[in-house]
Amino acid sequence: MRTDVEIIAEKGRFPRLRCSGSLQGRLTDADTVHLVGVAANPLGGDEISVRIEIGEGAFLRVRSVAAAVALPGRDSLRSSMTWHCSVAGQLDLDPAPTIVAANASHHSRVTVRGSAGARLRLRERVQIGRSGESSGFWSGQLDADIDDSPLLRHHVELGAGSVTDDELGRPLALISELRYPATNFVEFSPNDATMLSLAGDAALLTWQGQRLPIG
């Protein structure tokens, strides 16, 4: 199934939404949109695209009402989700975790184009396997530019067949959070997370383990 979501935020106006397919957007506050699954997603064969545009002086918070469970489809194991974000204002993107079920293969790509005055907080959480499972695969690519200058190119793989797959031990869970400009990570984060200072006054927090922390 093809799913498309478009969210446009402008200063002094409620966000505008256009949605088709298995995801719908719901305005839950003047500056907050929650994504709601209206059908099982993502399934193998699904392609999900979310496009976000934020004008200068506007603020948008994007959440989801529940975790996304990536499942293998009848004809394909692969599903994909892409985020295209154009930000001149402020974006706080923190959807619920993605759970990749056994045998499913899910691919995430986030592309951000921001202006020098933009403010960004982007968090992604992933868990390979439901209870008792460990054979799913996930890959994530995050590309962020500020004023056409590269800020970050970040690629991660988890699960069976990934670059981190090893019989002696492999991570099955991930938290990744990008902030621009860099600020203190005052919200909950695992004690053993790593925070990297990036060029251009940005920061990237990453954590890997066996199970996502509760919180």
Task: Describe the predicted segments one by one.
Residues 36, 124-215:
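A structural signal for small-residue-enriched, beta-sheet-centric alpha/beta enzyme cores
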